[in-house]
Regions:
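A contiguous pocket-lining binding segment that forms or flanks enzyme active sites
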Residues: 110-141
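Short, small-residue-biased leader/transition segments that mark boundaries at the very start
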Residues: 1-6
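C-terminal segments of enzyme domains that contribute to small-molecule binding surfaces
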Residues: 39-56, 64-80, 92-101, 107-112, ...
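Divalent-metal (often Zn2+) His-rich catalytic cores of metallo-beta-lactamase-fold enzymes
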Residues: 145
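Extracellular beta-strand-rich solenoid/capping regions of secreted or surface-exposed proteins
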Residues: 9-11, 41
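Acidic/polar low-complexity surface segments
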Residues: 26-41, 62-63
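A short, glycine- and basic residue-enriched loop/turn
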Residues: 12, 33, 66-67, 84-85, ...
Length: 198
């Protein structure tokens, strides 16, 4: 069972096992989307996810569509997950971070406080987004992105280590990062170099 105290749960919402939901969270209520016309849609929360005070997670827009938050996530106070977002497993959203509609956050992502993620943006697995970042384009896996607008500033070495990624793989990722972001090569040339070196 999950612990839910003085929070609002909308219809067609599923809460996984051993979740903790703190006061004044709103989960599965109607989306803040002018396209929504009252259709039956869903909000699904995985197991062992912690949802802190004043978090809002909207259900989806579109008949039969869903908003989903995975297992073992931590959504700190005042975070927002908009309609049709898909949040993977082991994701941390720091205080007041917000996902606009249809955003995708893959596994083991950390999003800093007050960061804003634009609609339809995808953040790749094991990435880290800095606090107050304005994310308007997709963020590749394994990197750190920060700024307004956010740009890739480095490899998320600490996150990769914590995720149990082997040292050999981390070394290859570091080399690939240098080729893509630091060499000055065009993308096609960078791909050629990686095929030669890795």
């Amino acid at each position: 069972s999950s612990d839910v105290c003085s929070s609002d749960l909308g219809g067609w919402t599923t809460i996984g096992k051993r979740c903790e939901i703190y006061p004044n969270a709103s989960i599965g209520l109607e989306p803040q989307d002018l396209k929504f016309k009252g259709e039956k849609s869903y909000c699904n929360i995985g197991d062992e996810t912690v949802i802190r005070e004043f978090v809002t997670i909207s259900r989806a827009t579109g008949e039969g569509e869903e908003t989903r938050v995975g297992n073992n996530c931590l959504l700190q106070a005042c975070t927002h997950v908009a309609h049709n977002c898909i949040v993977g497993n082991n994701v941390i959203m720091s205080n007041c971070a917000g996902l606009a509609g249809h955003a995708i956050v893959e596994d083991r992502v950390v999003i800093g406080g007050l960061a804003g993620i634009h609609q339809f943006v995808k953040i790749g697995r094991n990435a880290m987004v800095g606090g107050m970042a304005k994310v308007v384009q997709d963020i590749p896996p394994y990197v750190i992105a920060d700024g307004q607008p956010a740009r890739v500033i480095g490899l998320n070495s600490v996150g990769l280590s914590r995720a149990g990624i082997s040292e050999d793989v981390r070394r290859d990722l570091k080399q690939a990062f240098r080729i893509i972001y630091r060499s000055g090569f065009s993308l096609s040339k960078a791909i050629e170099e990686m095929e030669l070196q890795l």
